[in-house]
Amino acid sequence: MPIRKVEPKDKEELEELANKYLVPLYGDQTKALNERLTGYNYKHALVFEADNGEIEGLVAVSDKPGKNYVKLSTLVVKEEYLNKGIGKSLLEVALKYAKKSGKKEISVTVGEEVEENLHFFCKYGFKLKKELQDKYREGKKELVLVREIK
């Protein structure tokens, strides 16, 4: 499986991914991207890479010490690679990480208006925990979804 850790050389390609898919939903991603490349999330950020070296998707998990859950902070797949099992593969890696870490839950926040994301996570056992208004973007509702780790 072509999943590997994020490396500093990925910065430009990940910036393109963030600008196309994340900025419209969550605003500026500079800080989060830098954390995934060099800081807090570096060891928990993985990319799905094609044979030609192109990054097709990204998953990042935030794991704060002392918490009984992890947060799926990013899961994004390029549009041209949707419905090829990449999102499922990246999610499975995050779920395995959560289980191996002894966590009880994994959570993810999705924009209410992006129905395909909501359906994707619900298909894999995530359930609505709460709604957040204006957390990332003014006038936008976010849904916090949680899945128990067994």
What are these regions (language model features)?
Residues 54, 78-92, 101, 112-118, ...:
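Conserved glycine-rich acetyl-CoA-binding loop
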Residues 84, 88, 139-149:
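Accessory recognition modules or surfaces
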Residues 1-9, 147-150:
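Conserved N-terminal entry element of GNAT/NAT acetyltransferase domains
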Residues 1, 73, 141-143:
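Extracytoplasmic/periplasmic beta-strand context in beta-sandwich domains
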Residues 98-110:
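Conserved GNAT acetyl-CoA-binding A-motif
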Residues 107-111, 122-143:
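Conserved catalytic-core motifs of GNAT/GCN5-like acyltransferases
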Residues 5-74, 78-80, 91-92, 97, ...:
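Acetyl-CoA-dependent GNAT
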